[in-house]
């Protein structure tokens, strides 16, 4: 098999996928996690139709992705605010030689 392709087995089917060598381990782990999530949902819900289970798992994964995107956006906003405060304090220090420390943010 070419170094740019990987075979993974998902739900009893072998898929041959293009994948850079440095990402193959992550792809295998992702396939394993997908199988685990599908099996768990089947057990919990009693749904046996693979297409329905896959659709629900896909929706759940997308929801989780959107939550993580929002967390990242929130973290970015907080970090940008901290950078702005630090920049302002450094500018004030360079100009006046002293700064007042806001104890609430420490």
From Swiss-Prot:
A GO biological process held by the record: division septum assembly
Pfam families, sorted: ZapA (PF05164)
Localization per Swiss-Prot or TrEMBL: Cytoplasm
Residue ranges that the Swiss-Prot or TrEMBL entry lists as coiled coil: 21-80
Keyword Cell cycle attached: yes
GO cellular component: cell division site; cell septum; cytosol
Keywords from the named record: Cell cycle, Cell division, Coiled coil, Cytoplasm, Septation
InterPro entries registered for this protein in UniProt: Cell_div_ZapA-like (IPR007838), Cell_div_ZapA-like_sf (IPR036192), Cell_div_ZapA_N (IPR042233)
Superkingdom classification of source: Bacteria
Keyword match Transcription: no
Main function: Activator of cell division through the inhibition of FtsZ GTPase activity, therefore promoting FtsZ assembly into bundles of protofilaments necessary for the formation of the division Z ring. It is recruited early at mid-cell but it is not essential for cell division.
Assembly behavior: Homodimer. Interacts with FtsZ.
Family: Belongs to the ZapA family. Type 1 subfamily.
Protein name: Cell division protein ZapA
Organism of provenance: Haemophilus ducreyi (strain 35000HP / ATCC 700724)
Gene symbol of the encoding locus: zapA
